[in-house]
């Protein structure tokens, strides 16, 4: 129980029990009168302790002997405050004495041999028990060998052999340059002039650009059977768009020569 607040005995035990306790005390008094030797010890046991400063007690009223054996009423009146304080003091004193005895027995039970420094494990055993798995793990990681390098397959990429030819295919003594002419070659045999726009352009290295342009144009005209002036103009526009400005003069000269070979009327001057 706390030091500030203490429970009352009247709060813990119902009122009917007080009358039973009173009858029990009366029967004990009769036994005490018959046995004078045991009364002294029992009086010491049931003696009321001195009241503390926190719990003032009223003087204990003398009990009147009554030999009535009537049963307690169903609704007995509550006892006075003096009796409550007396019972409270007895309960508090009993609890204090029992707690004191328990503490003394508990403290007495502890022998000086059982100390904290002897109960705890030594440092070496603790370090060995706790750090042994860690040390084993560290040793394992120290001796860990990495797996062998995996042999990866070579990455297959599309070769640009169709876009650019090597120097072996070109005549000896001629170097390929980045600015080689691009010649439009048709990969489909369509019979309309618009097929020249949809045809695929192939970039190849050329030593004689004029001759290569002429062969390519004649092949396109023969495959697509181009004869109309509008289709030929579209073919010329395709060649000019596919090639850089430095080859435009060569393309125009080749186109004029083919135009004359086909015996076509001259194009309308703009």
From Swiss-Prot:
Misc. comment: Plants over-expressing OFP1 show stunted growth with general delayed development and shortening and thickening of all aerial parts. Leaves are irregularly heart-shaped and lobed and display curved surfaces. Anthers are short with a thick filament and style and stigma protruded from the flower. Siliques are short and uneven and produce few seeds.
Subcellular location: Nucleus
Motif LxLxL, chain ranges: 260-264
Biased composition (Low complexity): 92-111
Domain OVATE span(s) in chain numbering: 202-261
Span of the annotated motif Nuclear localization signal: 28-45
Name of the protein in question: Transcription repressor OFP1
Self-association and partners: Interacts with ATH1, BLH1, BLH2, BLH3, BLH4, BLH5, BLH10, KNAT1, KNAT3, KNAT4, KNAT5, KNAT7 and KU70.
Tissue-by-tissue expression: Expressed in roots, xylem of stems, flower buds and siliques.
Chain residue ranges for the region called Disordered: 25-116, 181-200
Gene Ontology molecular functions: DNA binding
Record function comment: Transcriptional repressor that regulates multiple aspects of plant growth and development through the regulation of BEL1-LIKE (BLH) and KNOX TALE (KNAT) homeodomain transcription factors. Controls the subcellular localization of the homeodomain protein BLH1. Plays a role in the regulation of cell elongation by controlling the expression of GA20OX1, a gene that encodes a key enzyme in gibberellin biosynthesis. May play a role in double-stranded DNA repair through the DNA non-homologous end joining (NHEJ) pathway along with KU70 and KU80 protein complex.
Keyword field contains DNA repair: yes
Induction of expression: By the DNA-damaging agents methyl methanesulfonate (MMS) and menadione.
Phenotype on disruption: No visible phenotype under normal growth conditions, but mutant plants are hypersensitive to the DNA-damaging agents methyl methanesulfonate (MMS) and menadione.
Matching NCBIfam families: A_thal_3678
UniProt KW keywords: DNA damage, DNA repair, DNA-binding, Nucleus, Repressor, Transcription, Transcription regulation
GO biological process, one term: DNA repair
GO cellular component, one term: nucleolus
Keyword Transit peptide among UniProt keywords: no
